[in-house]
Amino acid sequence: DITDYLREGENVISVQVFRWSDASWVEDQDFIRLSGIFRDVSIYSTPEVRVRDFSVVADLDENYEDATLDIEVDLTNYLKSNDEYTVEAMIYDEDFNPVLDSPISVSTDFTDATDYNEDATRKVVNLTQELKSPEKWSAETPYLYTAVITLKDSEGNEKEAVSTKFG
């Protein structure tokens, strides 16, 4: 029941149904060959300027020693303002100890944003960091790092944080 979270006027609840696997369960594992909502559903709110999507890719050099970490962050702005925001990324090891001395960061505004839809604009930002001698993931030693990506407004207030594991 989300009644307490509704505001006076129009409220929008979006539903997105994926027909492909996200690796959390194997498609067709239970012989269901249909689309639709047949599992648990969760609902959450997001800020008006938010991280719509992101990717983290670690690419090893030709000697398999060091890596280049490329992080792409897709921002959506429902305010359609040109305020400045900062995207920060911090990398943690398996014990959640920081790998970097300080977060990778980039500041951006939406002056050159593209239209996402009639209600929002969109901007993609990229962060890059060299990683010296990272632990390598393999089937024998499946080492995973955690990337935490934070979106902050011009006053340094955290608006949203997302994370993923990578290796």
Residue ranges of model-derived segments:
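Secreted/periplasmic carbohydrate-active enzymes, especially glycoside hydrolases
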Residues: D1-G167
